[in-house]
From Swiss-Prot:
Coiled coil: none annotated. Residues 13-22, 85-98 have a biased composition (Low complexity). The keyword Mitochondrion does not apply. Homodimer (via ligand-binding domain). Heterodimer. Homotetramer consisting of 2 canonical homodimers. Within the tetramer, each monomer binds one molecule of 9C-RA and a NCOA1-derived peptide containing an L-X(2)-L-L motif. Residues 183-206 are annotated as: Hinge. Keywords: DNA-binding, Lipid-binding, Metal-binding, Nucleus, Receptor, Transcription, Transcription regulation, Vitamin A, Zinc, Zinc-finger. Residues 40-49, 62-76 have a biased composition (Polar residues). 9-cis-retinoate binds at residues 290, 301. This is Retinoic acid receptor RXR. The lineage of its organism: Eukaryota, Metazoa, Spiralia, Lophotrochozoa, Mollusca. Residues 189-200 have a biased composition (Basic and acidic residues). Disulfide bonds: none annotated.
Length: 436
């Protein structure tokens, strides 16, 4: 099923009575309540939910818990709190046979193997570069070697690397790959074999772009990009302004995701899980890139300009400075274009570590396709900058860390009032706004 067919199955009217409000006051300094989602109608026989936490040195990590789905479940982060509220009965989904289905080229994961990944303990997909490993660790090692990437550990170079925490520290993950026997020369030999086939490398790269066209990713960015010719300085509290802008952007975020190649081919519940896992990073990346044109502040989709001094006066200067320094300034310095922004956001969207996914391998493959298409794009568009692809990927850890801190600072606390984000996204996906 192609993307247009997947979207046609969702073409209904917007759910009535949906309203979103801001309730920032009275919550500062108090942890939000735990999530108690009941999504037993979505996953069977078990479902897993994850949360972000902080590892040593402030590095982000993913933690998870696995519980039977028939009853309400709780998700709690000891290190931080998510912008959530208690949740009533979620809208029931009826996934008809004509609904979104996985692409024929992306078979559902049904492989059972007796081997586990020597690096993180996840299920191994085979022996890669001399070691039984999962697709995630295989791809991580291959990118590290091919791009000659270097990492730094923010702790004592002894971070725990397992299925839940493998994204915490890239340095320690790479060192564990080496210590468990992964061979750098195996990656290089693999690449050499491809080159010896003549045009094979070009065909492979071109094929990746055809399956994940950057042109379509750019179209998704342009379709939801607010047209801002002029902007005015914000007068209200900057936290309120940011939350209200993000509140409105959640609508366009769902529409953006549906335009990303293959997203609507995933199971509907997986679409919700991916958006739930990445919405904060996706929004932050968007307004950071938009703020390239702003002077010492961020430019919101509403046209309001939030100055650095206002953020400091509101007590959120530290995280605001990080946004300006680690994201906005870096994007400005390298003149990151919207195609590159869209690809980075697609990488965030296709997060195979999001807990509860049923199509983990498909999502992993889609992320790899985005990587391949982005690499091809940077090589062809910026041939004089051979390190540009790696430079782009280095923004992702900063984006993840800042996204967590923004949640911790309650930037998006009670983002949609009493409407929990899970239910809101579910309704948006099930009943999208009419195409314009």
């Amino acid at each position: 099923m192609d993307r247009s067919e997947g979207m046609d199955t969702l073409e209904n009217s917007m759910p009535s009575g949906m309203s979103m409000g801001m309730t920032m006051g009275g919550h500062q300094g108090h942890p939000p309540p735990d999530i108690k989602p009941d999504i037993s109608s979505l996953t069977s026989p078990t479902s897993t939910h994850g949360y972000y936490g902080f590892g040593p040195g402030g590095m982000p990590s993913m933690a998870s818990s696995t519980q039977p789905s028939p009853g309400p479940q709780q998700m709690h982060s000891p290190g931080m709190h998510s912008p959530t509220s208690s949740m009533g009965s979620p809208p029931m989904l009826c996934l008809s046979p004509s609904g979104p289905s996985p692409s024929p080229g992306l078979p559902h994961s049904s492989l059972h193997t007796k081997h586990i990944c020597a690096i993180c303990g996840d299920r191994a997909s085979g022996k890669h570069y001399g070691v039984y490993s999962c697709e995630g660790c295989k791809g991580f090692f291959k990118r590290t070697v091919r791009k000659d990437l270097t990492y730094a550990c923010r702790d004592d170079k002894n971070c725990m690397i397992d299925k839940r925490q493998r994204n915490r520290c890239q340095y320690c993950r790479y060192m564990k790959c080496l210590s468990m026997g992964m061979k750098r020369e195996a990656v290089q030999e693999e690449r050499q074999r491809v080159k010896e086939k003549g045009d094979g490398e070009v065909e492979s790269t071109s094929g990746a772009n055809n399956d994940m066209p950057v042109e379509q990713i750019l179209e998704a960015e342009l379709a939801v990009d607010p047209k801002i010719d002029t902007y005015i300085d914000a007068q209200k509290d900057p936290v309120t302004n940011i939350c209200q802008a993000a509140d409105k952007q959640l609508f366009t975020l769902v529409e953006w995701a549906k335009r990303i190649p293959h997203f609507t081919e995933l199971p509907l519940e997986d679409q919700v899980i991916l958006l739930r896992a990445g919405w904060n990073e996706l929004l932050i990346a968007g307004f950071s890139h938009r703020s390239i044109m702003a002077k010492d502040g961020i430019l919101l989709a509403t046209g309001l300009h939030v100055h650095r001094s206002s953020a400091h006066q509101a007590g959120v200067g530290t995280i605001f400075d990080r946004v300006l320094t680690e994201l906005v300034a870096k994007m400005r310095d390298m003149k990151m274009d919207k195609t590159e922004l869209g690809c980075l956001r697609a990488v965030v969207l296709f997060n195979p570590d999001a807990k509860g996914l049923t199509a983990v391998q498909e999502v992993e493959q889609l992320r790899e396709k985005v990587y391949a298409s982005l690499e091809e794009y940077t090589k062809s568009r910026y041939p004089e900058e051979p390190g540009r692809f790696a430079k782009l990927l280095l923004r992702l850890p900063a984006l993840r860390s800042i996204g967590l801190k923004c949640l911790e600072h309650l930037f998006f606390f009670k983002l949609i009032g009493d409407q929990p984000i899970d239910t809101f996204l579910m309704e948006m996906l099930e009943n999208p706004s009419p195409a314009t």
